[in-house]
Swiss-Prot record:
GO terms for cellular component: plasma membrane. This is Putative membrane protein insertion efficiency factor. The lineage of its organism: Bacteria, Bacillati, Actinomycetota, Actinomycetes, Frankiales. Belongs to the UPF0161 family. It is a peripheral membrane protein. It comes from Frankia casuarinae (strain DSM 45818 / CECT 9043 / HFP020203 / CcI3).
Length: 152
């Protein structure tokens, strides 16, 4: 766990690692987003998108570990992957996950859905789609239209 032994000078107030390598990787991801990713808006299988994941990983864990996390995510982003919500390790779980302390329940009788009281988290139904959006849905359709012409 070498990254935890970094001096305090290498981290900012939010706990993000700063340095030339993380700046370089973040700049490369921003160039990718400005050039290529803008053409393929809304086609990522994961939430957050792979480029947003890479930026968050580099900000949170620095250039080396964040770069490794970003490359591992890119290797997971392939046609056979189911996709879904995949946050950067060490970040907040987001609005789709409700966390409770282990052993705590909503009422003294236990959860109504039959789970045991020791379950640490309850997954809220996701609001995003799995896989790429259909041509008539999503951000890309808003940018380029439905492809059906002005009749529809």
């Amino acid at each position: 766990m070498v990254w935890r032994r970094l001096p305090r000078v290498a981290r900012n107030a939010d706990g993000a690692v700063r340095g030339p390598l993380s700046w370089t990787f973040a700049g490369l991801v921003r160039l990718y987003r400005a050039g290529w990713s803008a053409r393929n808006a809304g086609l990522c299988r994961f939430e957050p998108s792979c480029s947003a994941y890479a930026l968050a990983a580099v900000r949170r864990h620095g250039g080396v570990r964040g770069g490794v996390l970003a490359v591992a995510r890119l290797l997971r982003c392939q046609p056979l992957a189911a996709g879904g919500y995949d946050p950067v390790p060490g970040t907040d779980p987001g609005p789709g996950i409700v966390r409770r302390p282990r052993g705590a329940t909503a009422d003294p009788g236990g959860p109504p859905d039959g789970r045991s009281a020791g379950d640490p988290a309850v997954a809220v139904p996701p609001v995003h789609r799995h896989g790429p959006p259909s041509p008539s849905q999503g951000m890309r359709a808003e940018i380029v239209g439905s492809g059906r012409g002005p009749w529809v």
